[in-house]
């Protein structure tokens, strides 16, 4: 089993519902450690850069508008198979299809306002962590 790092974003809808702590406690209960974290309000430019992979997709503008609608809680999670573990905890992108007990089933309202983002592969995790955190701002625990 490999120790990995992955990026997790608690999106504006979940921040507004004041469930940051409830979501973070699920990561910790699953054995993931938070090795970096911050609350930020993304600018349009930052959101467009972060989601540039979706630039040509029809939902891009709505995604960016949503991600700048309020603060987000950005964190780096570390642990064995952190990427897959985080994705399992999040549940399906559409909360209506998410398994009961997953973060999205419990806290998300729609496929757009779906509470959390998580890296989908080691390469994207490395890029996403670097986007938000310089190396000196991530701490082994």
UniProtKB/Swiss-Prot annotation:
Cellular component terms per the entry's GO annotation: cytoplasm
Annotated ATP binding sites: 11, 59, 87, 93, 104, 114
Active site: 117 (pros-phosphohistidine intermediate)
Places the protein is found: Cytoplasm
Single GO BP term: CTP biosynthetic process
MF terms (GO), sorted A to Z: ATP binding; metal ion binding; nucleoside diphosphate kinase activity
Required cofactor names: Mg(2+)
Principal localisation: cytoplasm
Taxonomy, superkingdom: Bacteria
SUPFAM superfamilies: Nucleoside diphosphate kinase, NDK
Annotated Gene3D superfamilies: Nucleoside diphosphate kinase-like domain
SMART domains reported in the protein's UniProt record: NDK
UniProt record similarity statement: Belongs to the NDK family.
Assembly and binders: Homotetramer.
Role noted for this protein: Major role in the synthesis of nucleoside triphosphates other than ATP. The ATP gamma phosphate is transferred to the NDP beta phosphate via a ping-pong mechanism, using a phosphorylated active-site intermediate.
Name of the protein in question: Nucleoside diphosphate kinase
Source organism of this protein record: Variovorax paradoxus (strain S110)
Gene behind the chain: ndk
